[in-house]
């Protein structure tokens, strides 16, 4: 029985070790006060910014997405997004007549 358990236990450890490396287990990206685990995303509602931490061949990248800069046109006005809304609904919009 012990002969069977040792290889099985070793195989389980190898699989768990490999899966944690592939998933970036325990790894994270930092954006100011935000710590984003690999494979997850967080929203900074104070700046309406989306942070996503990705694993590209064991190289971690912090992807940052924020609201576009709007160039005002005549006959249009800026409407702020809802401060508590998730990204991108928190971004301001341009409302134009006609």
From Swiss-Prot:
A GO CC annotation given for this chain: extracellular region
Post-translational modification: Contains 4 disulfide bonds.
Source organism superkingdom: Eukaryota
Subcellular location: Secreted
Signal peptide segment: 1-24
SMART domains given in the database record: SVWC
Keywords attached to this entry: Amidation, Disulfide bond, Secreted, Signal
Tissue/organ expression: Expressed by the venom gland.
Principal location class: secreted
Lysine amide: residues bearing it: 97
Family listed: Belongs to the scorpion La1-like peptide family.
Record-given protein name: La1-like protein 13
């Amino acid at each position: 029985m012990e002969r069977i358990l040792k290889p099985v236990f070793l195989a389980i450890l190898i699989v768990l070790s490999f899966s944690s490396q592939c998933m970036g287990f325990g790894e994270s990206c930092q954006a100011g006060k935000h710590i984003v685990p690999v494979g997850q995303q967080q929203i900074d509602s104070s700046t309406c910014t989306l942070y996503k931490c990705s694993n590209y061949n064991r190289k971690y990248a912090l992807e940052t997405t924020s609201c576009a800069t709007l160039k005002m046109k005549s006959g249009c006005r800026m409407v702020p997004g809802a401060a508590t809304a998730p990204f991108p609904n928190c971004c301001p919009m341009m409302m134009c007549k006609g």
